[in-house]
Amino acid sequence: AAPDFRIYWDNAYSIHHLYDENQDFLVEILEECTKAGNPDIVYKFTSTSKVSFPGSGIAAVAASKANLEDFRSYMQIQTIGHDKLNQLRHVKFFKDLDGLHAHMRKHAAIIRPKFELVLDTLEKELGGLGIGEWTKPHGGYFISFDSMEGCAKAIVAKAKEAGVVLTGAGATYPYGKDPKDSNIRIAPSFPTPEDLGKAAE
């Protein structure tokens, strides 16, 4: 890689587990880069945007000491100060890491049945047919569905004709360009269970 190559690691779903057991955890990339002799190659970002208030949460960055010093030198002239009242609101509400986890269990109780409904419908309608594969996530907000090659855009269009609006085909790829035109990101968290059941069928 080029000497100035950097990894910007968006760890948005680090505490978004659907289950109390059977949780997935990502490798601690900053630690691994440090072990490999490249501590300055990575910046890790996270926020409470999908925990408390969308677009109005508390953000955080983790990086090497050198990168944080560099980062602070820019930040101190880009802003006169962070929203300390919002920070205080978050601290008073969540209190600590246990408070965050307790809150996220409430999220999981709401969205887990929606995920299970979609996954059960996919298995019932498409299981064993060899025309699609899908993830069975333990957390986050999406199910990744892979259709047969060249079909994703057509599936999304047909679903829209039937009154079901899906995320655009290939949305998970850079610039939305899926070379196989097979990936659809399913987001079951927003609809009501009743609407979701109809849409999934």
Q: Where does each model-flagged region fall?
A:
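Active-site pre-lysine segment of PLP-dependent enzymes
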Residues: 1-8, 12-54
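Short beta-strand segments
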Residues: 8-11, 46, 60-62, 135-136, ...
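Conserved core segment of the aminotransferase class I/II
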Residues: 31-112
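PLP-dependent enzyme catalytic core of the Aspartate aminotransferase-like
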Residues: 38, 161, 176-201
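Short, solvent-exposed loop/turn elements at beta->coil junctions and helix N-caps
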Residues: 46-49, 131-132, 170-175
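A common structural junction motif
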Residues: 79, 161-167, 201
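Conserved glycine-rich beta-strand-loop-beta hairpin in the small C-terminal domain of fold type I
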Residues: 105-119, 131-146
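Helix N-cap motif at beta-to-alpha junctions
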Residues: 148-152, 191-193
